[in-house]
Amino acid sequence: MTGDPGAVVYEVTLEVEAAIADAYRAWLRAHVAQMLALPGFVSARSFSVREPVADGHVAFCVHYVLRDDDALDAYLREHAPQMRADGVARFGTRFRASRRVLRPLD
């Protein structure tokens, strides 16, 4: 992570229809760059998920490292609705997103 005990990981897992996976992946690269420009974001790493996803979808996962809980709370309050709406405007119901927050054990 960052070595900072206050840092948190905001994990976003995306299940995307296989038919739009290439277009979604291209959009996701730009989206991650926009997220990293927001206050409190330190770094991000994107992954493809190895386990198969049911019903013709592929999965991606992004780990965003944020400075601390306050930065995450500010993002969720001030920026998340707009950032999430962009993906929905482009891809509609052709993807699903789930999110969780991870904290270091030590």
Predicted regions and their residues:
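Short, flexible turn/loop "capping" segments at secondary-structure junctions
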Residues: T2-V8, A54-G56
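Active-site-flanking beta-strand signature of metal-NTP-handling nucleotidyl enzymes
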Residues: A7-E15
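An amphipathic, aromatic/His-enriched active-site/gating alpha helix that lines ligand/cofactor pockets
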Residues: L36-V42, D55-V58, V65-V101
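Short, low-order "capping/linker" segments at domain edges
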Residues: L102-D106
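Short, solvent-exposed loop/turn elements at beta->coil junctions and helix N-caps
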Residues: F47-P52
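Beta-strand elements of well-folded, non-transmembrane domains
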Residues: V16-A18, D68
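Short amphipathic alpha-helical segments
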Residues: I20-S46, M83-A85
